[in-house]
Amino acid sequence: MMSERAMPKPNCTEEVDVGTIEFARLGRRVVEGRFDGGSMTSDGGVMLLGEVDRKLGLLEAAARCIADPRSPLLIKHGVRDMLRQRVYGLALGWEDLNDHGALRCDVAMQTAVGVDREVASAPTLCRLEKWADRATAWRLHRVLVDQFIASFKTVPEELVLDFDATDNPLHGQQEGRFFHGYYDSYCYLPLYVFCGQQLLCAYLRSSCIDGARHAAAILKLLVRRLRQEWPEVRIIFRGDSGFCRQRIINWCERAG
């Protein structure tokens, strides 16, 4: 048996240099990630998210898809900044717009968005969402597909498009709510299309329809765009038995 004297003891007072993470500057403000300053925010990951977003330019491009009806002389929070705030909040788990009553004062959120003051309030973000219409949705999906294409350094030989319809449960009297027997709840039935880990389409729909509805039209549009970029790429449609519809099968056979 090892004696108490011989047992090693941890040195709890030893200083460990964990280094410093340097982020992009905001004006004259130097932004660093350190581990010796105490608990300043519970959402520090938003800084990394902001850096990745700026490198991709995703929300910068998405903001150009949303028409701003406001007078330029009266704008305090731009569309790009509000979109960043909303999307970053969702990524952090803050889904409710009311959460931004507190988040707008969070220094980490402000810095990630790219401002040095309070970001937009919940009512302002609500108005942003109201500006989006069907044309906005089409433009946003074009951004997703263009980002997907830009992610390839070489021409792919094969692409597998995964189609799936799933439930989005509802807990109130939202417009377009219907009871879905399979999911045994009131829900929406969005249609998603992925290629690997990348999202190509997210189409919000009522649940009173066939889960495969719209799939043929979306498949046709995606294949057309992808083959504009890569004429020889092999494209595979993949879905569960719910997508075994004659219209989809016939189109796939014609398109090759």
Where are these regions (language model features)?
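Short, surface-exposed basic-aromatic patches at helix termini and helix-loop junctions that form
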Residues: I249-G256
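Dynamic "connector" segments at or just before major functional cores
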Residues: M1-D210, H214-P231
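Acidic/histidine-rich, metal-coordinating catalytic segments
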Residues: D164, E232-C244
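Conserved protein kinase catalytic core
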Residues: L170, C244-Q246
